[in-house]
């Protein structure tokens, strides 16, 4: 990822509370962090997985053409009955026969269990963005919310295995701040 490709995704979140910053900037497995802080049962609830076109701001990062399909997977991470994170991942179609073929059958398993248990997987630095209604992921992230916020913080990074990448974007829902 270069600066031109990430012009509106920043290397550090600005104007954010220390509590929210702790969630956003943690480089470990978000799944494991939520599981440790969740007093209820943790679960992954898939809402979409299919070959699809990707968001405009993902094209250059993933080196995809506008008409090129990728596997798009969207899930909510729940603490009990409360969604705390909306996760969106993108894998180029051509990489589904290679390094990332195991992602097709993840179902309600966490992607983090695949990414953080393989020592060969490399991660780029996190990038951050405050999503508004103008971003396509904002409305998708808000589907499970009773009240739509004015904005939502998101982070994303590339995970690479054998030269093939998956882009993972995590959108933090307001309820994440209620976890101890």
UniProtKB/Swiss-Prot annotation:
Gene3D superfamilies: Chorismate lyase-like. Its EC number is 4.1.3.40. Pathway: Cofactor biosynthesis; ubiquinone biosynthesis. The keyword Transmembrane helix does not apply. One of its GO terms (biological process) is pyruvate biosynthetic process. Keywords: Cytoplasm, Lyase, Pyruvate, Ubiquinone biosynthesis. It is an enzyme of class 4 (lyase). One of its GO terms (molecular function) is chorismate lyase activity. It is found in: Cytoplasm. One of its GO terms (cellular component) is cytosol. Substrate binds at residues 73, 111, 170. The keyword Lyase applies. Its main location: cytoplasm. It catalyses: chorismate = 4-hydroxybenzoate + pyruvate. It comes from the Bacteria. InterPro entries: Chorismate--pyruvate_lyase, Chorismate_lyase_/UTRA_dom_sf. Removes the pyruvyl group from chorismate, with concomitant aromatization of the ring, to provide 4-hydroxybenzoate (4HB) for the ubiquinone pathway. PANTHER family: CHORISMATE PYRUVATE-LYASE (PTHR38683:SF1). Belongs to the UbiC family. This is Probable chorismate pyruvate-lyase. The lineage of its organism: Bacteria, Pseudomonadati, Pseudomonadota, Betaproteobacteria, Nitrosomonadales.
């Amino acid at each position: 990822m270069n600066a031109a490709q990430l012009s509106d995704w920043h290397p550090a979140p600005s104007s954010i509370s220390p509590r929210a910053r702790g969630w956003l900037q943690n480089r470990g497995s978000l799944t494991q962090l939520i599981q440790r802080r969740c007093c209820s049962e943790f679960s992954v609830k898939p809402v979409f997985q299919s070959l699809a076109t990707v968001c405009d701001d993902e094209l250059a990062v993933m080196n995809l053409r506008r008409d090129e399909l990728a596997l798009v997977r969207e899930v909510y991470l729940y603490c009990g009955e409360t969604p705390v994170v909306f996760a969106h991942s993108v894998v180029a179609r051509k990489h589904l026969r290679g390094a990332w073929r195991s992602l097709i059958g993840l179902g309600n398993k966490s992607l983090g269990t695949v990414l953080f248990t393989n020592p060969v997987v490399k991660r780029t630095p996190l990038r951050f963005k405050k999503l508004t209604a103008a971003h396509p992921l904002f409305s998708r992230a808000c589907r499970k919310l009773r009240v739509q916020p004015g904005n939502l913080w998101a982070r994303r990074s590339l995970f690479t295995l054998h030269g093939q990448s998956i882009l993972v974007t995590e959108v933090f829902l307001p309820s994440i701040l209620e976890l101890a």
